[in-house]
Amino acid sequence: MKNKRLLFITLSFLTIALFSCQKMEQPGLGDFPKDSNPPGGPLNFYVAFDGTSSDPLRNAVDSIRASFPADNPLTSTAGSSGQAIKGASGKFIKYAKPNDWAVKAASFTVAFWAKGNGQTLNNSGTNGPEAVFSFGSAHNAADWPNTTFLIFEGDNTKCAIKFYVYSKTGDKWFTWEGANMIAGIRDNQWRHYVFSYDAATSTMTLYINGVANPITSVWGGHGGVNIDDSKITELRIGRGPRTDGDADGAGGWMQSSWKGELDQFRMYSTALTAAQVSALYASKL
């Protein structure tokens, strides 16, 4: 018995020593925030933008898989919590994919903090929409098959919000426009936005600062969103799905970028409940 105990202690020591050496040999990735989410959990993509490195790629690491963006030309600024990113005309942060979000999502939620000041502008500097995020698409026509994107358009008096989703079986505009445009959200103040699609009811709910907008948008019995992951060529934060040189030109609404600030960008493969949205807003993260 004594010999067995000695052998166990010796093996335990060697195991600890081995893993310690392996950890020391790994290159440091730097510190980045990790959200409370178990492996394989519903939070599939999360960027806090809280990095303080001189390397902009490290400042935009996805915390779910420690994935670096392919490009980040945007500058850091004070955020809703810690640091954020400042949008710029024609620029965006490029990621290979939103991880496995499209594969797993039947219901889904997109959440972020944003700040905008006055009239939204296109990339030519005239009135037009500004895109929070989009998927680059394998389709290169003048329309927008296989992409998904979110745009704001308007000023502080009234602003439209439009969330477009393209699935394997159809497409849908979830909109708050016309008589349902939203006042007071372009006043250069941070606000928390959550878009929660529930496959059970085919309904999209918009929350602003933890409060549900009374206008919901229904996708006529569509059910699970069913996005084709194989058609997503990149995830863009801060710009629409089209690029310079496309047929719609520099002022084109589908390539317009976000000119304000963005922070704490999350994508879930589940529909957050009202209580979960309220808790997320209250956390200020």
Model regions and ranges:
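Short surface loop/edge beta-strand patches of beta-sandwich-type extracellular domains
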Residues: L29-P39, A88-F108, W176-A183
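Extracellular, beta-strand-rich glycan-interacting domains
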Residues: F45-T52, T109-G118, G252-K284
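Short tryptophan-centered beta-strand motifs in secreted/extracellular beta-sheet-rich domains
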Residues: F112, N188-Y197, L206
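Glycan-recognition/cleft segments
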Residues: G128-K168, G224
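Short, aromatic/His-centered strand-loop micro-motif at the edge of beta-sheets
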Residues: Y164-H192
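Flexible glycan-contacting loops in extracellular carbohydrate-active proteins
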Residues: T216-G260
